[in-house]
From Swiss-Prot, chain B:
Gene that produces this protein: Stx5
Signal sequence bounds: none
Residues in compartment: Vesicular: 355
Species per Swiss-Prot/TrEMBL record: Mus musculus (Mouse)
Keyword Ubl conjugation in annotation: no
GO BP: any one term: early endosome to Golgi transport
The protein's name: Syntaxin-5
Membrane topology: Single-pass type IV membrane protein
GO MF, one annotated term: SNAP receptor activity
Its biological purpose: Mediates endoplasmic reticulum to Golgi transport. Together with p115/USO1 and GM130/GOLGA2, involved in vesicle tethering and fusion at the cis-Golgi membrane to maintain the stacked and inter-connected structure of the Golgi apparatus.
Residues of the t-SNARE coiled-coil homology domain: 263-325
Any Gene Ontology CC annotation: Golgi membrane
Coiled coil: 287-318
CDD domains the UniProt entry points to: SNARE_syntaxin5
Amino acid sequence: MKLYSLSVLYKGDPKAVLLKAAYDVSSFSFFQRSSVQEFMTFTSQLIVERSGKGSRASVKEQEYLCHVYVRSDSLAGVVIADSEYPSRVAFTLLEKVLDEFSKQVDRIDWPVGSPATIQYTGLDDHLSKYQNPREADPMSKVQAELDETKIILHNTMESLLERGEKLDDLVSKSEVLGTQSKAFYKTARKQNSCC
Amino acid sequence: MIPRKRYGSKNTDQGVYLGLSKTQVLSPATAISSSSDSTPLPTPVALVPSPPDTMSCRDRTQEFQSACKSLQSRQNGIQTSKPALHAARQCSEFTLMARRIGKDLSNTFAKLEKLTILAKRKSLFDDKAVEIEELTYIIKQDINSLNKQIAQLQDFVRAKGSQSGRHLQTHSNTIVVSLQSKLASMSNDFKSVLEVRTENLKQQRNRREQFSRAPVSALPLAPNNLGGGPIILGAESRASRDVAIDMMDPRTSQQLQLIDEQDSYIQSRADTMQNIESTIVELGSIFQQLAHMVKEQEETIQRIDENVLGAQLDVEAAHSEILKYFQSVTSNRWLMVKIFLILIVFFIIFVVFLA
């Protein structure tokens, strides 16, 4: 499960403009990194150009999956992840990032912006945060916590069963104790009454 | 906001725009004129006419203004003209803002009306999902910006409120309040339209499921009938299948795919939510089991308690018995000692006196 890039684009009429992007290319060898980055930028632009407004789509490219979300106001986001990464989390991330972006960056700057001029720095944080979808996505987080709770509860059940066995032992032992004490009392009384 | 606005009004021009805009644009104007009844003198310029294309009655504002001016000059002479001019300029600025907001409001109302018409359409094949989505988005943005503008207007009124007269202030407050109430009613309408839309979507899905499941259930039936039963029945079932397939024209299936693509994300969200829900239900049942088991163990614990208590009683009773016995034994020993003493004494006497 890995995210490779997260980019925000503006879907212009003929071409898509890259507004801001964040990359995580640490898994590639040092010499490939720049070309990989370039390739990812190109792919993102191409995908945004080919997908319609207000649509979500997932495109498979070799073993990578590109999740794209174009809002109806032409702002688009692309996430490139490996095929294991859950698409729902990717779309949640896109929605969140685009919302944030549209709040922080003025609408007028969208068609003319470039990575150098746009002042929005949240992408890298989001990218590193969403590397682990279990932590970042609230729904998966809740799910994971619930699973944990379930395991804990199962453990509790087991210990409760053990406790039940021990209690049964205690019951039998206390019964033996009761009969023995009764016998003790009887012999003591016999001792007393005989002479 | 500005480009959106243009686009929206252009879009709605041919539709319901005229019918609604008349009433909507009029309403701020009527609010202005009604509230200005109490303040005719200091706010002559507040009665700037609404755009002529939307006015249905005759525009007599100019006459009224001139009458006002003549009245004013007759009453106060020249000395009051300067502050009045200043106030008038402020006032006109305020009126301009108010009018702009009113216009925007009416535009948004028109869009909302269009959305309502689109959303209330029940047909399965003529569903303009994209348009509706876009309109919804636009209206949402419009409402937001209107909210912002009204807040600005309020700030403006507050800033200028201290300088201008009481009447002017109440007048502007009335305008702001009326604009706000318009906006509130519009957002209510918007909400109800959205509700209608979701309801429609639900119904459509139900119908689609009915039609798309039908052929699947008819398929296994057909071969059976062809094999043994009368041929007419088989043909009949096939005919019904044909009918069912006809419903799934390429157009429909294409639409289905499109909608499915759009829905996949929502579907996956719903699935996850369902997962979470089922896990929570499971957890609940586990907790119940736990409670049940703990309750069961309470009985065994009570039994242990009783046993231990009984043993304690028995042991205490035995202890007291043994104590008693011990006491009796010790008292017996003294007796024996006494007897022995007496015997020894007698023995000594016997030995001394008889030997």
